[in-house]
From Swiss-Prot:
Its EC number is 1.14.13.166, 1.14.13.29. It is an enzyme of class 1 (oxidoreductase). Belongs to the non-flavoprotein flavin reductase family. Pathway: Aromatic compound metabolism; Xenobiotic degradation. This is 4-nitrophenol 4-monooxygenase/4-nitrocatechol 2-monooxygenase, reductase component. Inhibited by methimazole. GO terms for molecular function: 4-nitrocatechol 4-monooxygenase activity; 4-nitrophenol 2-monooxygenase activity; FMN binding; riboflavin reductase (NADPH) activity. Transmembrane segments: none annotated. It catalyses: 4-nitrophenol + NADH + O2 + H(+) = 4-nitrocatechol + NAD(+) + H2O; 4-nitrocatechol + NADPH + O2 = 2-hydroxy-1,4-benzoquinone + nitrite + NADP(+) + H2O; 4-nitrocatechol + NADH + O2 = 2-hydroxy-1,4-benzoquinone + nitrite + NAD(+) + H2O. Involved in the degradation of para-nitrophenol (4-NP). Catalyzes both the initial hydroxylation of 4-NP to produce 4-nitrocatechol (4-NCA) and the subsequent oxidative release of the nitro group from 4-NCA to produce 2-hydroxy-1,4-benzoquinone. It can also use 4-nitroresorcinol as substrate with a rate of nitrite release similar to that observed with the two physiological substrates, 4-PN and 4-NCA. It comes from Rhodococcus opacus. The 4-NP/4-NCA monooxygenase is composed of an oxygenase component NpcA and a reductase component NpcB. The gene is npcB. Induction: By 4-NP.
């Protein structure tokens, strides 16, 4: 008779499909991370982006090491995070498609630190300060050197599908700018 693994107090390897299923329950925003190297623009749809701290302003971005965008960032040492609006799912699909002519018919501002998508909801221009390998991906730690936000709602990603964010009308919690603490409404 087989013993229950929980009774043995031994962690079993997690199945890749189950891991992806569980992590897929975490909703995230959708970004296109862009970079340029030797005058060639690169870009990829990335949801593994998070703020790290505000003093100095820093972010973490995780990219698959097989992506051309990954190689461009490693060489250029800077990139732009383009935060997509709720009406930009087709743009996210384009930049997620291998081999696609990603920048065709896309308004782009070519900047010193790489391309910035003109129609993005918001953007953060970043300078890499550190990076480390994490399995198939590389984690870039970067300082934000420029940022701007427009108006509108973000594109969201949840359980393998794009969607949009709908705030609660009578939210019980909000963040105050005075103390940056979450407090009751």
């Amino acid at each position: 008779m087989l013993e229950d693994p929980m009774k043995q107090n031994v962690l079993q390897p997690l199945d890749k499909a189950e891991f992806r299923n569980v992590v897929g329950h975490f909703a995230s925003g959708v970004t296109i991370v862009t970079a340029a190297h030797d005058g060639v623009p690169y870009g990829a749809t990335i949801s593994a982006v998070t703020s790290l701290c505000d003093t100095p302003p820093m972010v973490l971005v995780c990219l698959n090491q097989k992506l051309g965008t990954h190689a461009a960032i490693r060489k250029a040492r800077h990139f732009t995070i383009n935060i997509l609006g709720e009406d930009q799912a087709s743009l996210a699909h384009t930049f997620a498609t291998p081999g696609a002519d990603k920048f065709a018919d896309v308004a782009v501002h070519h900047r010193q630190h790489g391309p910035r998508l003109a129609e993005a909801l918001a953007y953060l221009t970043c300078r890499v300060v550190d990076d480390l390998e994490g399995g198939t991906h590389r984690i870039f730690v970067a300082e934000v050197v420029e940022a701007q936000a427009g108006t509108g709602n973000p594109l969201s990603y949840y359980r393998g599908r794009f969607g949009h964010f709908v705030p609660y009308r009578n939210a019980m919690w909000r963040t105050t700018q005075a103390d940056n603490a979450v407090s009751p409404h």
